[in-house]
Amino acid sequence: MEKRQELYAGKAKSVFRTDDPDKMVLVFRDDTSAFDGKRIEQLDRKGMVNNKFNAFIMTKLQEAGIPTHFEKLLSDTESLVKCLDMIPVECVVRNVAAGSLCRRLGVEEGITLTPPTFELFLKNDALGDPMINESHVESFGWAKASDLAKAKELTFKVNDVLKAIFAEGGMILVDYKLEFGLYKGEVLLGDEFSPDGCRLWDAKTKEKLDKDRFRQGLGGVIEAYEDVGRRIGIDFDA
Protein backbone atom coordinates (compact mmCIF):
# COMPACT_ATOMS: atom_id res chain seq x y z
CA MET A 1 0.00 0.00 0.00
CA GLU A 2 1.57 3.28 -1.13
CA LYS A 3 0.86 6.43 0.88
CA ARG A 4 0.39 9.42 -1.42
CA GLN A 5 -0.57 13.08 -1.02
CA GLU A 6 -2.08 14.53 2.13
CA LEU A 7 -5.83 15.08 1.88
CA TYR A 8 -6.13 17.23 4.99
CA ALA A 9 -4.80 17.75 8.48
CA GLY A 10 -7.11 17.94 11.47
CA LYS A 11 -6.32 18.95 15.04
CA ALA A 12 -4.49 15.73 15.92
CA LYS A 13 -4.46 13.55 12.77
CA SER A 14 -3.49 13.85 9.13
CA VAL A 15 -5.18 11.91 6.33
CA PHE A 16 -3.38 10.66 3.23
CA ARG A 17 -4.55 9.10 -0.02
CA THR A 18 -3.20 5.72 -1.08
CA ASP A 19 -2.91 3.94 -4.41
CA ASP A 20 -6.27 2.31 -3.55
CA PRO A 21 -9.13 4.86 -3.89
CA ASP A 22 -11.11 2.98 -1.21
CA LYS A 23 -8.36 3.21 1.43
CA MET A 24 -6.68 6.04 3.32
CA VAL A 25 -3.88 6.33 5.86
CA LEU A 26 -4.53 8.04 9.19
CA VAL A 27 -1.43 9.55 10.78
CA PHE A 28 -1.78 10.23 14.50
CA ARG A 29 0.32 13.24 15.50
CA ASP A 30 1.58 14.40 18.90
CA ASP A 31 -0.59 17.53 18.69
CA THR A 32 -3.10 18.00 21.50
CA SER A 33 -5.81 20.65 21.33
CA ALA A 34 -8.63 21.96 23.47
CA PHE A 35 -11.35 24.60 23.30
CA ASP A 36 -12.01 24.13 19.56
CA GLY A 37 -8.33 24.37 18.68
CA LYS A 38 -7.64 27.57 20.63
CA ARG A 39 -5.02 25.78 22.73
CA ILE A 40 -2.57 23.42 21.03
CA GLU A 41 0.49 21.67 22.49
CA GLN A 42 2.78 18.80 21.53
CA LEU A 43 2.82 15.83 23.89
CA ASP A 44 5.56 13.25 23.39
CA ARG A 45 4.32 9.73 22.44
CA LYS A 46 0.71 10.86 22.05
CA GLY A 47 0.45 9.93 18.37
CA MET A 48 1.71 6.42 19.05
CA VAL A 49 -0.47 5.96 22.13
CA ASN A 50 -3.68 7.09 20.41
CA ASN A 51 -2.97 5.07 17.27
CA LYS A 52 -2.50 1.83 19.20
CA PHE A 53 -5.37 2.64 21.56
CA ASN A 54 -7.69 3.25 18.62
CA ALA A 55 -6.60 0.06 16.86
CA PHE A 56 -7.31 -1.98 20.00
CA ILE A 57 -10.77 -0.48 20.52
CA MET A 58 -11.80 -0.67 16.86
CA THR A 59 -10.77 -4.33 16.77
CA LYS A 60 -12.81 -5.08 19.91
CA LEU A 61 -15.83 -3.34 18.37
CA GLN A 62 -15.46 -5.25 15.11
CA GLU A 63 -15.30 -8.51 17.08
CA ALA A 64 -18.60 -7.48 18.70
CA GLY A 65 -20.23 -7.04 15.28
CA ILE A 66 -19.92 -3.25 15.00
CA PRO A 67 -18.66 -2.25 11.53
CA THR A 68 -15.78 0.24 11.49
CA HIS A 69 -13.46 1.78 8.92
CA PHE A 70 -10.35 0.34 10.62
CA GLU A 71 -8.25 -2.06 8.55
CA LYS A 72 -4.86 -2.49 10.24
CA LEU A 73 -1.93 -0.79 11.92
CA LEU A 74 0.80 0.27 9.51
CA SER A 75 3.30 1.70 12.01
CA ASP A 76 3.43 3.19 15.50
CA THR A 77 1.59 6.28 14.29
CA GLU A 78 -0.20 5.14 11.11
CA SER A 79 -3.33 3.10 10.43
CA LEU A 80 -4.97 1.97 7.21
CA VAL A 81 -8.70 2.70 7.05
CA LYS A 82 -11.56 2.57 4.58
CA CYS A 83 -12.39 5.84 2.85
CA LEU A 84 -15.77 7.02 4.14
CA ASP A 85 -18.19 9.71 3.06
CA MET A 86 -18.39 11.26 6.52
CA ILE A 87 -21.59 12.45 8.18
CA PRO A 88 -20.72 15.93 9.59
CA VAL A 89 -22.22 15.15 12.98
CA GLU A 90 -20.85 13.92 16.31
CA CYS A 91 -22.92 11.35 18.21
CA VAL A 92 -22.44 11.72 21.97
CA VAL A 93 -23.54 9.29 24.67
CA ARG A 94 -23.34 10.28 28.32
CA ASN A 95 -23.46 7.69 31.11
CA VAL A 96 -22.49 10.17 33.83
CA ALA A 97 -23.05 13.93 33.98
CA ALA A 98 -19.87 15.87 33.16
CA GLY A 99 -18.49 18.62 30.94
CA SER A 100 -20.84 20.68 28.80
CA LEU A 101 -23.93 18.84 30.06
CA CYS A 102 -23.32 20.20 33.56
CA ARG A 103 -22.72 23.71 32.22
CA ARG A 104 -25.81 23.69 30.01
CA LEU A 105 -28.26 22.20 32.49
CA GLY A 106 -26.76 23.22 35.81
CA VAL A 107 -26.51 19.64 37.06
CA GLU A 108 -23.87 18.27 39.40
CA GLU A 109 -20.90 16.44 37.92
CA GLY A 110 -20.90 12.73 38.64
CA ILE A 111 -24.64 12.01 38.55
CA THR A 112 -25.33 8.65 36.89
CA LEU A 113 -27.67 9.06 33.92
CA THR A 114 -30.30 6.33 33.61
CA PRO A 115 -30.84 5.76 30.78
CA PRO A 116 -27.75 7.26 29.13
CA THR A 117 -28.40 10.41 27.11
CA PHE A 118 -27.83 10.71 23.36
CA GLU A 119 -26.90 14.05 21.80
CA LEU A 120 -25.91 15.34 18.37
CA PHE A 121 -23.43 18.11 17.58
CA LEU A 122 -22.66 19.65 14.19
CA LYS A 123 -18.97 19.40 13.32
CA ASN A 124 -18.21 23.07 12.73
CA ASP A 125 -15.34 24.70 14.64
CA ALA A 126 -16.31 28.20 13.51
CA LEU A 127 -19.70 27.78 15.19
CA GLY A 128 -18.30 25.97 18.22
CA ASP A 129 -19.78 22.57 17.25
CA PRO A 130 -23.38 23.55 18.14
CA MET A 131 -25.82 21.05 19.58
CA ILE A 132 -28.46 20.01 17.04
CA ASN A 133 -31.32 17.52 16.84
CA GLU A 134 -32.35 14.77 14.48
CA SER A 135 -34.74 17.05 12.58
CA HIS A 136 -31.87 19.42 11.76
CA VAL A 137 -29.80 16.56 10.36
CA GLU A 138 -32.56 15.47 8.01
CA SER A 139 -33.84 18.95 7.07
CA PHE A 140 -30.39 20.28 6.14
CA GLY A 141 -29.43 17.11 4.32
CA TRP A 142 -26.49 16.20 6.55
CA ALA A 143 -27.64 12.57 6.58
CA LYS A 144 -30.62 10.45 5.64
CA ALA A 145 -32.96 9.60 8.50
CA SER A 146 -32.23 5.89 8.08
CA ASP A 147 -28.46 6.44 8.20
CA LEU A 148 -28.74 8.61 11.31
CA ALA A 149 -30.94 5.97 12.95
CA LYS A 150 -28.28 3.35 12.20
CA ALA A 151 -25.55 5.60 13.62
CA LYS A 152 -27.60 6.03 16.80
CA GLU A 153 -28.15 2.29 17.09
CA LEU A 154 -24.42 1.62 16.67
CA THR A 155 -23.53 4.35 19.17
CA PHE A 156 -25.51 2.56 21.88
CA LYS A 157 -24.03 -0.82 20.89
CA VAL A 158 -20.58 0.73 21.33
CA ASN A 159 -21.66 1.85 24.78
CA ASP A 160 -22.58 -1.67 25.84
CA VAL A 161 -19.27 -3.10 24.62
CA LEU A 162 -16.97 -0.40 25.95
CA LYS A 163 -18.61 0.09 29.34
CA ALA A 164 -17.87 -3.58 30.03
CA ILE A 165 -14.27 -3.38 28.77
CA PHE A 166 -13.44 -0.32 30.86
CA ALA A 167 -15.28 -1.66 33.91
CA GLU A 168 -13.03 -4.73 33.83
CA GLY A 169 -10.10 -2.31 34.04
CA GLY A 170 -11.57 -0.53 37.06
CA MET A 171 -12.83 2.50 35.13
CA ILE A 172 -16.09 4.31 34.39
CA LEU A 173 -16.88 5.31 30.81
CA VAL A 174 -18.39 8.71 31.57
CA ASP A 175 -19.14 9.87 28.02
CA TYR A 176 -17.77 9.74 24.49
CA LYS A 177 -18.25 11.03 20.97
CA LEU A 178 -18.34 9.04 17.76
CA GLU A 179 -18.33 9.91 14.07
CA PHE A 180 -19.82 7.84 11.28
CA GLY A 181 -19.63 7.72 7.52
CA LEU A 182 -20.84 5.75 4.53
CA TYR A 183 -18.79 3.10 2.75
CA LYS A 184 -20.53 1.74 -0.35
CA GLY A 185 -23.87 2.61 1.23
CA GLU A 186 -23.17 1.07 4.65
CA VAL A 187 -22.91 3.14 7.83
CA LEU A 188 -19.53 2.51 9.48
CA LEU A 189 -17.88 3.90 12.59
CA GLY A 190 -15.13 6.26 11.48
CA ASP A 191 -12.56 8.65 12.93
CA GLU A 192 -11.06 7.29 16.18
CA PHE A 193 -11.79 6.17 19.71
CA SER A 194 -9.17 7.28 22.22
CA PRO A 195 -9.01 9.19 25.52
CA ASP A 196 -9.03 12.35 23.36
CA GLY A 197 -12.72 11.81 22.60
CA CYS A 198 -14.15 10.31 25.77
CA ARG A 199 -14.14 10.75 29.52
CA LEU A 200 -12.80 7.96 31.71
CA TRP A 201 -12.64 8.00 35.50
CA ASP A 202 -11.05 5.59 37.94
CA ALA A 203 -14.00 3.71 39.43
CA LYS A 204 -12.78 4.05 43.03
CA THR A 205 -11.05 7.42 43.21
CA LYS A 206 -12.89 9.17 40.33
CA GLU A 207 -9.49 10.37 39.08
CA LYS A 208 -9.77 11.73 35.54
CA LEU A 209 -7.83 9.65 33.01
CA ASP A 210 -8.68 11.44 29.76
CA LYS A 211 -8.16 14.74 27.91
CA ASP A 212 -9.75 16.65 30.79
CA ARG A 213 -6.26 16.39 32.31
CA PHE A 214 -5.10 18.64 29.45
CA ARG A 215 -8.16 20.91 29.45
CA GLN A 216 -7.98 21.47 33.20
CA GLY A 217 -4.18 21.68 33.49
CA LEU A 218 -3.90 18.58 35.69
CA GLY A 219 -0.77 17.27 33.95
CA GLY A 220 0.22 13.67 33.35
CA VAL A 221 -1.90 13.43 30.20
CA ILE A 222 -0.02 10.73 28.31
CA GLU A 223 0.76 8.84 31.52
CA ALA A 224 -2.99 8.65 32.15
CA TYR A 225 -3.70 7.51 28.58
CA GLU A 226 -1.09 4.77 28.91
CA ASP A 227 -2.50 3.73 32.29
CA VAL A 228 -5.95 3.35 30.74
CA GLY A 229 -4.50 1.30 27.89
CA ARG A 230 -2.54 -1.04 30.13
CA ARG A 231 -5.61 -1.64 32.31
CA ILE A 232 -7.54 -2.97 29.30
CA GLY A 233 -4.66 -4.98 27.86
CA ILE A 234 -2.84 -2.72 25.39
CA ASP A 235 0.92 -3.20 25.05
CA PHE A 236 2.23 0.14 23.83
CA ASP A 237 5.77 -1.20 23.46
CA ALA A 238 4.82 -4.07 21.14
Swiss-Prot record:
GO terms (BP aspect): 'de novo' IMP biosynthetic process; cobalamin biosynthetic process
Pathway per the UniProt entry: Purine metabolism; IMP biosynthesis via de novo pathway; 5-amino-1-(5-phospho-D-ribosyl)imidazole-4-carboxamide from 5-amino-1-(5-phospho-D-ribosyl)imidazole-4-carboxylate: step 1/2
EC number of the protein: 6.3.2.6
Keywords: ATP-binding, Ligase, Nucleotide-binding, Purine biosynthesis
Alphabetical list of InterPro entries matching this protein: SAICAR_synt/ADE2_N (IPR028923), SAICAR_synt_PurC (IPR033934), SAICAR_synth (IPR001636), SAICAR_synthetase (IPR050089), SAICAR_synthetase_CS (IPR018236)
Protein name in the entry: Phosphoribosylaminoimidazole-succinocarboxamide synthase
Signal peptide residue numbers: none
MF annotations from Gene Ontology: ATP binding; phosphoribosylaminoimidazolesuccinocarboxamide synthase activity
Recorded family membership: Belongs to the SAICAR synthetase family.
A GO CC term attached to the entry: cytosol
PROSITE patterns membership: SAICAR_SYNTHETASE_1, SAICAR_SYNTHETASE_2
NCBIfam families reported for this sequence: purC (TIGR00081)
